[in-house]
Amino acid sequence: MEKKISVVIPTYCRPLLLMECLKMLARQKFNREDFEVIVVSDGPDLITKQTVVSWKHTGLLDIEYIPLERKRGPAAARNMGWRMAAGTLIAFTDDDCLPDPLWLQTIWEAYQGEEMIAYSGRIIVPLPLRPTDYEWNIAQLEKARFVTANCVCTRKALGSIDGFDERFELAWREDSDLEFRLLQQGIPIQQLPEAIVVHPVREAGWGVSLREQKKSMFNALLYKKFPRLYRSYIRQQPNWSFYVMILCCGVFLAALLLEAGTLALTALGIWALLLGAFIWKRLAHTSHEWPHVTEIVLTSVLIPFLSVYWNLYGAVRYKVLYL
């Protein structure tokens, strides 16, 4: 049965978060018969299947569960979802998001029957007065121009660009890639600030900033595909301070071996100044409680090495000159 809107949600083994998202979709001020929800699990996931089945039995949502045969990432999950969807419009959100009750109604009222159009809604990230570094970074989604936590495309628009690029295997840069390909094809992206999705920050363990660095490899892929757009909208130049910090560490060790004390102290001093600036930047808008400060200091020592490693790994993997 054809629908006005299909909501596609990628997920994997996060039933409690998914449950809250589905509760908000069940509260939509939009005719229940006019939209469907497609939950796509990034790999076999019995507990997610049971969650979706329980919702289906309530009759509060027209909802389907689709599992990928193996873990392939959210881009692949979204592709599976929209290709199985019956909606004229495909709305994307995430399992840790809470769509506003007027979300779908706002989207449909903005749609004028165009075959090729996309919409970008507004993201709200609730924060405590002094957030952690991780919380502050997530809050930058509020400034993003186009994110998959709250975006909509017509089926024809998605089909014209073949959906998401599944080489983006983690939740990183696949939304910018979709945006850039829409722009490349001349498909308009309309800002829709009245279409609101709240994105609470989920709990993260100690040192999450270290694990996040792996995503940097996909910067190289996006840069290879869209060098001009990448430099215009993502990052104008490499993070040279990280490279200088690593160089200083190498010079310091070499100077110690050569017993060049002045050179060693100079390299150590430059490294310490750059490290201090990096720590200051991360603490400028975040919590100053000692456990958080300790985490910031320790992870700031390691982040430059991990960031450069994963950026260069991506450059080699995707065969592009990228720093």
Feature map (PLM): residue ranges:
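N-proximal low-complexity "stem/linker" segments adjacent to membrane-targeting elements
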Residues: 1-27
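Short aromatic/hydrophobic "clamp" motif used to bind/position activated sugar donors
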Residues: 90
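Catalytic donor/gating beta->alpha subdomain of glycosyltransferases that bind UDP-sugars
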Residues: 170, 176-231
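Membrane-embedded multi-pass helical conduit in multi-pass membrane proteins
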Residues: 245-318
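Acidic donor-binding segment of Leloir-type glycosyltransferases
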Residues: 23-67
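Conserved donor NDP-sugar-binding/catalytic core segment of glycosyltransferases
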Residues: 98-131, 200
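Cell-envelope/extracellular polymer assembly enzymes that use nucleotide-activated donors
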Residues: 3-6, 36, 41, 177
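Glycine-rich, basic loop-to-helix element that forms the pyrophosphate-binding segment
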Residues: 68-85, 145-149
